[in-house]
Amino acid sequence: MKKRILSIVLCLVMVFSLLPFTASAASNTPINDMNFPDPVFREYVRKIAGSSVLTEEKARQIEVLDVSASNIKKVLGDRDPITSLRGIRYLKYVKDLNCSGQKLTTLNLELNSRVEKLNCSGNQLTDLWLDPRGNSLKYLTCSVNELTALDLSKSPELTELSC
């Protein structure tokens, strides 16, 4: 009987000792060159986060992400074009994404299933990946790119397409 109680207590201690670590790892993402390798995208995310760490609370507030060339110029001044949106997966609550006029060659939104409106026109995209389990995409503008194929089979809510 004592062994059983001891086993239960040890299991509970193990579970509760892992909770704070797991919670902090999931809710705080450093905005650094490892998570956001493109320097301009990283600078923009730092600006909208108001910090060098993206908290879960702040990520929830970011539903509109405008990293279009014109908005970057307005917010940050003259900068080189963005070539990668790697790290966008940490902005999982974004519903409206505008990344037009940059120099993106790939755009991976497989972990951004909440995106409803996407404007990625005027890039050099050869690949656009959407969540293969399904997504919320309603409006897609992807003209002036180098896409040769686009799988929209998991986008049942799509009502407007301009490519």
Short names for language-model regions:
Residues M1-K2:
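N-terminal secretory signal peptides that target proteins for export/translocation
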Residues I5-L10, F16, F21-D96, S113, ...:
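N-terminal capping/linker segments that flank leucine-rich repeat
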Residues S7-V9, T141-V144:
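Short helix-onset patch at the extreme N-terminus, typifying the N->h transition
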Residues L65-S68, V75, L97-C99, E116-C120, ...:
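Conserved hydrophobic beta-strand positions in leucine-rich repeat
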Residues G87-R89, L107-L109, L130-D131, L150-D151:
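Leucine-rich repeat
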